[in-house]
Amino acid sequence: MLVPKRVKHRREFRGKMRGEAKGGKQVDFGQYGLQATTSSWITNRQIEAARIAMTRYMKRGGKVWIKIFPHKSYTAKAIGVRMGSGKGAPEGWVAPVKRGKVMFEVAGVSEEIAREAFRLAGHKLPVKVKFVKREAE
């Protein structure tokens, strides 16, 4: 699973998820992409589940690029612990994804296979998604 090798601060503020993605809105590496149409945090487990769903459907054919990385930690207190006495322990890692961001790209497969692979991957993610093609240069 994707996790940072080391971080400067173990506990981060949650932050705001306003507006669109600044960059990464086009298909850069592959022929087809999976674009988020809503904003959310995506955990490293959800990214891995989507990747497995895509690669299994494509039967190891083609190439997959993951264009998001879970660099933000989130914390949680243990069950049954009262409020107060500091922030909880780091629980996991998330990638903040804003609307418009292309999260996955594929190349080397037909459009029908790519569409179905992205449909299966979209069911594993907490955001609404759409299929996008690379723009002709």
UniProtKB/Swiss-Prot annotation:
> Signal sequence span per UniProt?
none
Matching SUPFAM superfamilies = Ribosomal protein L16p/L10e
Q: Which GO terms describe its biological process?
A: translation
Keyword tags: Ribonucleoprotein, Ribosomal protein, RNA-binding, rRNA-binding, tRNA-binding
What does UniProt give as GO cellular component?
cytosolic large ribosomal subunit
Question: Do you know which InterPro entries this protein is assigned to?
Answer: Ribosomal_uL16, Ribosomal_uL16_bact-type, Ribosomal_uL16_CS, Ribosomal_uL16_dom, Ribosomal_uL16_sf
Q: Which GO terms describe its molecular function?
A: rRNA binding; structural constituent of ribosome; tRNA binding
The superkingdom listed in its UniProt entry is Bacteria
Q: Which NCBIfam families match?
A: rplP_bact
Q: How does it assemble?
A: Part of the 50S ribosomal subunit.
Give the family, as the similarity comment puts it. Belongs to the universal ribosomal protein uL16 family.
| Described purpose of this protein according to its UniProt entry | Binds 23S rRNA and is also seen to make contacts with the A and possibly P site tRNAs.
In Swiss-Prot or TrEMBL terms, this protein is called: Large ribosomal subunit protein uL16
Instruction: Name the source organism.
Output: Streptococcus suis (strain 05ZYH33)
